[in-house]
UniProtKB/Swiss-Prot annotation:
SUPFAM superfamilies: Crustacean CHH/MIH/GIH neurohormone (SSF81778). Its main location: secreted. This is Alpha-latrotoxin associated low molecular weight protein SGV242-280. Coiled coil: none annotated. Belongs to the arthropod CHH/MIH/GIH/VIH hormone family. It comes from Steatoda grossa. It comes from the Eukaryota.
Amino acid sequence: MSKLHFLILLSVIVSVFCIEPQDIGCTGISTAEFEEKDATCSKCEEDYSGNGMIDRCRSDCYSGPFFKSCVELLNKGYDEKDENVKPEW
């Protein structure tokens, strides 16, 4: 199983370093913003194993409904984890 995790991590790293904003039709977006949004799509694809999910997430230069859903899904996942944490008092 660790080999699978390594391959997923490697593919995410390669996809982040190989793509540039103009490759997917994004103009007027900073490199930092592009990298942040692309990392979000990569995380979403990694966590939810969607076939072709990253392409749908990147569509319309990260302004489509799929990207927004991905962000909400990732944020909800983090919120659920926070709810289970008991205070240390």
